[in-house]
Amino acid sequence: MAIELNQIWDFPIKEFHPFPRALLGVGAHDIIGVEAKNLGFKRTLLMTTGLRGSGIIEELTGKIEYQGVEVVLYDKVESNPKDYNVMEAAALYQQERCDSIISIGGGSSHDAAKGARVVIAHDGRNINEFEGFAKSTNKQNPPHIAVSTTAGTGSETSWAYVITDTSDMEHPHKWVGFDEATIVTLAIDDPLLYYTCPQHFTAYCGFDVLAHGSEPYVSRLDFAPSLGNALYSVELVAKHLREAVFEPRNLKAREGMMNAQYIAGQAFNSGGLGIVHSISHAVSAFFDSHHGLNNAIALPRVWEYNLPSRYERYAQLATAMGVDTRNMTTVQAADAAVEAAIRLSQDVGIPDNFSQVRVDSYDKNRMNTGKYAGKGEVIKGDDKSVLAISEHIQGDWCTPGNPREVTVDSMIPVVGHAINGTY
C-alpha cells in the first residue's frame, strides 16, 4: 500500500539504546577496587577534574590499589571537556601502557573519558572527527568504570558524550557524539559521594536532571519507552532537589536525586533532548559556563517557547512538579509548569539570567582555564553574541528533537531574555 509522505511522522523508526551494568546505592563506591579487579584491570588511567584534594580521589584510589590495580592519574579535565583534554589523556594512556579507564566526577570526567576511549581505539585520530552519530569504526575500546560524584550528568548511563572543539577560538564549537561503543562498562552511583558537593553546584546539577527528564517527555521523537522514566525523574527532582541543596547530608534527598539522575539518563538515552541543551552547549562554547547552570537558566524560557506545541505534555509536567492542576484547563496547567520551574530555580538560588553569572561562583570545576582563561567573567548580551549563540543552536545535534520549530530569528529573543531578562 502506498503511503503519502505527509502521513509519515518526523521519526517513523525509533531506536532503543542499551544501558550499562550499574551499581546504585549507599556504599556502592566501596567495591570499586573489587569490580576493577574482576573486570581484569591491571593498570588503569583515572580521569577527573578538580576533585584532587577533596578526599574522594584519594579514597577511591586507595580502594583500587588495594586490589592490586595500578593507578595513573590524569586530573586535568576541564569543565565542558575540551578536545585537548581528551587528546592529552589518550596520549598518557598509551605512554603509561594502561589497559582501562576509570572516570570520577560529573559529566565532564565521564565525557572526556569516553572521548579518550574513542581516540585510543582509532590510533590517535583527533577527537573532533567523531562528532555525530556512530562515527566509531573500531568498537573495541578500553573498558571503563564511571563513578559519579554529582547528581546531574546521566553520562554514566548514556551513549552520548559532549566535547568542545577549540581548534578555532573565534568560532568555538561544542558538539555531541552518539556512539554505543562509548557506553561505559560499569556505572557506579553512590549518594554518599554527593555529600561534599557545594550547594550551588548541587542546584545546577539538579536542573541538568530536570532538563534530562523533561526534554524527552516533550520531544518530537515521542519515544514511548522513555516517557515513564522521563516523567518520574521530573517528579523526583521536584520532590528532592530543595532538600538536597539545603540539607547536603540528607540521605533520602541525595538518594532521590541519584535515582532521578539515573532514570533521566535512561530517558534521554533513546528519547532525545531539545533546545534547553542546545542553548546550554552554545553558551558554554563561547563562555565556558557551567552546563547545569546553563540548563537552569534556559529551561523556563524554553518551556515557555515550546508550550504551543505540547500543551498537554507540559500540563502533565506541572502535575509532576507538584502543582495541583485539578481545576485548571490544559493551557493553564501548562503555564503553571513554567511557573513551577521558575519557582524551583529561585528557591535553590539559580541566577535570573546569564548576565548575573560570574566565574568566581565556581569551585573545583576548572572553569575558564586553558584556552578559556577569562572568557566567562561576563557573559555578553550584545547583538553579536546573541546572534552567534542563536546560530550555534541551529547546528546542535539536540535541536532536531525540539517539539517546536527552531530558527535563528526565533531564538534571538529567547537567548536575549536568557542573558538579560528577568521573571
Curated annotation (Swiss-Prot):
Phenotype caused by lack of the gene: Cells lacking this gene do not grow on methanol.
E.C. number: 1.1.99.37
Catalyzed chemical reaction(s): methanol + A = formaldehyde + AH2
Keywords: Magnesium, Methanol utilization, NADP, Oxidoreductase, Zinc
Pfam family, one: ADH_Fe_C
Induction, per UniProt: Constitutively expressed, with a significant increase of induction in the presence of methanol.
Named cofactor requirement(s): Mg(2+); Zn(2+); NADPH
InterPro entries named in the record: ADH_Fe/GldA, ADH_Fe_C, Alcohol_dehydrogenase_Fe, NDMA_methanol_DH
Any one GO BP annotation for this protein: methanol oxidation
Molecular function, one GO term: oxidoreductase activity
Top-level taxonomic group: Bacteria
PANTHER family xrefs: ALCOHOL DEHYDROGENASE, ALCOHOL DEHYDROGENASE 4
Biological function: Catalyzes the oxidation of methanol to yield formaldehyde. While the in vivo electron acceptor is not known, N,N-dimethyl-4-nitrosoaniline (NDMA) can serve this function in vitro and is reduced to 4-(hydroxylamino)-N,N-dimethylaniline. It is also able to use ethanol and formaldehyde with an activity comparable to methanol, and has a weak activity with methylamine as substrate.
Family the UniProt entry places it in: Belongs to the iron-containing alcohol dehydrogenase family.
Quaternary structure (record): Homodecamer.
Name of protein: Methanol:N,N-dimethyl-4-nitrosoaniline oxidoreductase
Provenance organism: Mycobacterium sp. (strain DSM 3803 / JC1)
Native organism taxonomy: Bacteria, Bacillati, Actinomycetota, Actinomycetes, Mycobacteriales
